[in-house]
Curated annotation (Swiss-Prot):
BP-aspect Gene Ontology terms: lymphocyte chemotaxis; macrophage chemotaxis; neutrophil chemotaxis; secretion by cell
Origin species: Mus musculus
Name of this protein: Chemokine-like factor
Result of knocking out the encoding gene: Mice exhibit embryonic lethality.
Keywords associated with the record: Chemotaxis, Cytokine, Membrane, Transmembrane, Transmembrane helix
Membrane topology term: Multi-pass membrane protein
Length: 152
């Protein structure tokens, strides 16, 4: 008689560290955008930051609703890592440009929060890179023949 297999339940995305980092990234980017808007920063700063907010929100919805498991035509972790790298580069440039000239205090705060966005983006990219590893984190352990027979 077969023994029933235990059902492996995964934690929902909203209860993971990746969700926390993405949500923190979203909040910091929105804060940076608000400071750019209130400080009347140049339009490219606001547009780039707003675009990043939109993309982060879309990835949050994608992972929270489980659409990445339904739409298998894309390799979502790779797209997320590429997005994180582009975001880090763009926000780093915007933040440096916001801090260089003599600008208002609110624009400077937008630049500082932009640097925090870059930090959160790098952390998010590091977490997503773990999914892209081809080799497992633990060393490979050869299973005995009894373990193989139990799974069948």
């Amino acid at each position: 008689m077969e023994t029933p297999r235990p059902v492996v339940s995964r934690r929902p995305f909203c209860c993971t560290l990746k969700c926390f980092v993405k949500f923190l990234r979203l909040v910091v980017t929105v804060t940076s955008m608000i400071f750019f808007i209130v400080g009347q920063a140049p339009e490219p700063y606001i547009v780039i930051t707003g675009f990043e907010v939109t993309v982060i929100f879309c990835f949050l919805v994608l992972y929270t609703c489980g659409l990445d498991k339904i739409m298998r035509s894309f390799f979502w972790p790779l797209l997320d890592v590429i997005n994180s790298m582009v975001t880090a580069l763009c926000m780093l440039i915007v933040s440096v440009l916001a801090l260089i000239p003599e600008t208002s205090t609110k624009t400077i705060l937008g630049g500082v929060f932009g640097f925090l966005t870059v930090t959160c983006t790098i952390a998010d990219c590091a977490l997503m890179c773990q999914k892209l590893r081809f080799r497992p984190r633990q060393p490979y352990q050869k299973k005995s023949t009894n373990d193989i027979d139990d799974r069948e």
